């Protein structure tokens, strides 16, 4: 079974906001989850102020007092900017920290079930892995992260694409996708890509229980996994692409597989990354 931390429908959702168009899109998706499932929404705004090294202790104390006076106004500003997109007055959290650290810390501190955040639409060299807060959060989060670029359609989750293999992350992603499909009556397409040299599967990708509980379709294609998944996503135009991911350790830190990383760069529509969780005994 999926680890209890991967709850769907999500009870509590964290929505980081930097007041950008992408953040507004994330707020609109959060509104859907609240109206559809009654999810609690917390909006997080992080700022990271680097003070000049020559500040004296007195100047630092004065600055902190001024910052405290400004906090109430800043909180109200974030609330007023968020309310039109959510349709209600959300819980607001202001944090002085780097955005990625603030998001990861808040998601754990408040026992969140999901993070919904915007992806800025940059491409090419401007969208290198470490250049995106969204990608850094996805890489390090232990929770499912829904990353979006634009506002949701009238029916936000009508078609789901879930690339699937026989690995544990793939199985967990499929189970999470099946939960969503069953809950919102969405069409679920399960895609398996056979790369050159792959051994044939010895068991069905989709179990009987999932087939009986969901509107599910299976597709098998040959080719490079990342490229084929990206092409299928562009052709099928799902409302959300759901992928499992397993972090691997290396000398330079943790990383995702090359397939997962490539899909994150190539994905056009909403992308929901489901991190691998160890199963409870």
Question: PLM ranges: what are they?
Answer:
Residues 1-9, 29, 42, 48-51, ...:
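Structural beta-alpha unit
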Residues 2-61, 158-220, 238-240, 266, ...:
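Small/aliphatic-rich secondary-structure junction motif
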Residues 22, 123-124, 249-251:
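Short glycine-rich, flexible loops that bind phosphorylated cofactors or substrates
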Residues 130-133, 255-260:
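Charged helix-capping and loop-helix junction motifs
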Residues 133, 141, 212-214, 267-268:
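Short, structured coil segments at secondary-structure junctions
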Residues 132-151:
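Short, structured interface segments
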Residues 117-119, 145-150, 271-275:
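Short beta-strand elements of ligand-binding domains
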């Amino acid at each position: 079974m999926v680890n209890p931390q991967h709850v769907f429908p999500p009870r509590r959702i964290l929505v980081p906001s930097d007041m950008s168009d992408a953040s507004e899109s994330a707020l609109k998706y959060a509104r859907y989850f609240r109206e559809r499932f009654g999810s609690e929404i917390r909006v997080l705004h992080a700022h990271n102020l680097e003070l000049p090294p020559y500040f004296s202790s007195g100047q630092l104390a004065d600055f902190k007092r001024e910052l405290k006076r400004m906090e109430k106004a800043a909180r109200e500003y974030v609330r007023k900017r968020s309310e039109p997109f959510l349709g209600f007055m959300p819980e607001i959290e202001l944090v002085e920290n780097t955005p990625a650290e603030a998001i990861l810390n808040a998601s754990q501190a408040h026992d969140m079930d999901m993070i919904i955040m915007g992806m800025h639409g940059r491409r090419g060299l401007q969208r290198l892995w470490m250049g995106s807060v969204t990608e850094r959060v996805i890489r390090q989060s232990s929770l499912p992260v829904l990353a979006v670029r634009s506002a949701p359609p009238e029916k936000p989750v009508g078609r789901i694409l879930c690339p699937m293999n026989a690995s544990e992350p793939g199985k967990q992603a499929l189970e999470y996708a099946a939960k969503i499909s069953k809950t919102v009556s969405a069409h679920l397409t399960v895609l398996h890509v056979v790369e050159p040299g792959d051994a044939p599967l010895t068991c069905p990708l989709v179990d009987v229980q999932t087939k009986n509980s969901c509107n599910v379709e299976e597709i098998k294609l040959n080719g490079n996994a990342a490229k084929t998944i990206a092409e299928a996503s562009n052709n099928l135009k799902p409302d959300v692409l759901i992928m499992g991911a397993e972090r691997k350790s290396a000398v330079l830190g943790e990383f995702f597989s090359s397939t997962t990383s490539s899909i994150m760069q190539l994905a056009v529509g909403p992308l929901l990354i489901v991190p691998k969780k160890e199963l409870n005994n």
